[in-house]
Swiss-Prot record:
The gene is glmM. Its EC number is 5.4.2.10. Belongs to the phosphohexose mutase family. It comes from Chlamydia pneumoniae (Chlamydophila pneumoniae). This is Phosphoglucosamine mutase. One of its GO terms (cellular component) is cytosol. One of its GO terms (molecular function) is phosphoglucosamine mutase activity. The lineage of its organism: Bacteria, Pseudomonadati, Chlamydiota, Chlamydiia, Chlamydiales. The active site is at S106. It is an enzyme of class 5 (isomerase).
Length: 458
């Protein structure tokens, strides 16, 4: 019998509202079966799959559904419980598992959930493999089922969080500590709520925690990397040295300096790239940024003598460009930072430790490290839309786009794109004059809102 589902995989795995397709228990069971069949086709013998999740209420039912699908096909599951996405990638490699699966909708609200699949090397699986899995799910064709003792079992990995904490700490220089540093930390009530405080406290920092009390329905709710205002205020209030905000699954980071100024992924990339080049630790003097990267940041990186490759937005695309061009450092404005010397996916805590190391070794405040980087005026507005109609098919939007580009001139740029994980149109305008950029971005966002919007924007 065919299972009728809409397209499963988006730009970052499967994602959607819990109990609505594609994020239903029924489809999740089929997804587990499809992953199992792909693994069984790859080689014979017993197979193991690591399963982690964030703190969403719906994580329990999807964890059980996924495990049921995998076990029914003879796969042994190693169950981690709540752990950051990069922790799943690490444990998959450490346990020599055949695959890793993270149940999370990343920065989305609690009502959403998702599934990210990692290969045995800890990389997100390819588009080709995703398509193969999707075809199996839609056709519900999984081949013969194992019988009797051949069905799979699940095993809870008791020390998974502790192992990941030790792995992350090992990316910080031996013999160094964070003693004397006061850090405001916001874990978005998400997967990092235990791991991140443990890492920084065990390295002897004074940690002031926000977003570390998950209820299942408060993940990302006015906190974390999407709401850095929380740590901006707290850093000033507590006279902290810096603030660190993670998203719901811990794979992205936004920082705040001691003055309360936001340090986004563009700035973190610049700081770390400059340090690595100075230490001759950046192969080929190359980095990967994205099409959203601020023009001023690109000029700064090129001024350091670095070759900058740009990819589409999304950590999958950043990683693909890194592997293609033999690059070990890449990142995007939203805070996904990939240090291939340490992990195979974005890792917010590892990224924070690299910046902290640079601060300590250079005896600098975070604001000192960002001072040489002059960003171009840039405005980003997120417009909630009813549906993702191709923008070029809407005449008024096309006319407004041309008018805005004419007003900006040849040195300005506009980027319009739909989010790959939410019904949002992102409007980015960049130029030389902040007031003009703000006004033009608002004008363009207003037209998109009038044509497609729900009346909500950020």
């Amino acid at each position: 019998m065919q299972q009728s589902v809409r397209k499963l995989f988006g730009t970052d795995g499967v994602r959607g509202r819990a109990n609505f397709e594609p994020m239903t228990v029924e489809t999740t069971v089929l997804l587990g079966k499809a992953v199992a069949r792909v693994l069984r086709e790859g080689r014979s013998g017993k197979h193991r799959v690591v399963v982690g999740k964030d703190t969403r209420l719906s994580g329990y039912m999807f964890e059980n559904a996924l495990i049921a699908g995998l076990n029914s096909m003879g796969i042994e599951t190693l169950v981690l419980g709540p752990i950051p996405t990069p922790g799943v990638a690490f444990i998959t490699r450490a346990y020599r598992a055949d695959a890793g699966i993270m149940i999370s909708a990343s920065h989305n609200p609690y009502r959403d959930n998702g599934i990210k699949i990692f290969s045995l090397e800890g990389f997100k699986i390819s588009d080709v493999l995703e398509q193969r899995i999707e075809t199996m799910v839609s056709e519900a064709d999984f081949g013969p089922l194992p019988e009797d003792h051949a069905v799979g079992k699940n095993k809870r990995v008791i020390d998974a969080m502790g192992r990941y904490v030790e792995f992350v700490k090992a990316t910080f220089p031996k013999g160094r500590t964070l003693k004397g540093l006061k850090i405001v930390l916001d874990c978005a009530h998400g997967a990092s709520y235990k791991v991140a405080p443990s890492v920084f406290e065990e390295l002897d920092a004074e940690v002031i925690c926000y977003g570390c009390e998950p209820t299942g329905i408060n993940i990302n709710e006015h906190c974390g990397a999407l709401f850095p205002q929380v740590i901006q205020k707290a850093v000033i209030e507590h006279q902290a040295h810096l603030g660190i905000a993670l998203d719901g699954d811990g794979d992205r980071i936004i920082m705040v300096d001691e003055k309360g100024h936001i340090v986004d992924g563009d700035m973190i990339l610049s700081i770390c790239a400059g340090d690595l080049k100075k230490r001759s630790a950046l192969p080929h003097n190359r980095v990967v940024a994205t099409i959203m990267t601020n023009f001023g940041v690109l000029k700064y990186l090129e001024g350091l003598g670095l070759q900058v490759f740009t990819s589409p937005v999304g950590d999958r695309h950043v990683l693909h460009a890194m592997l293609e061009h033999e690059v070990t450092l890449g990142g995007e404005q939203s805070g996904h930072m990939i240090f291939l010397d340490y992990n195979t996916t974005g890792d917010g805590i590892v990224s924070a430790l690299q910046v902290l190391r640079i601060m300590i070794e250079s005896e600098s405040m975070l604001s000192d490290l960002t001072a040489p980087i002059v960003k171009s005026p840039q405005t980003l507005i997120n417009v909630a839309v009813r549906e993702k109609i191709p923008l070029e098919t809407i005449p008024l939007i096309e006319r407004t786009l041309r008018d805005v580009q004419d007003a900006l001139g040849p040195s300005g740029r506009i980027l319009l794109r739909y989010s790959g994980t939410e019904n949002i149109c992102r409007v980015m305008v960049e130029g030389h004059k902040k007031h003009q950029v703000d006004c033009l971005a608002k004008a363009l966002a207003d037209v998109i809102d009038a044509e497609l919007g729900t009346g909500s924007r950020e």
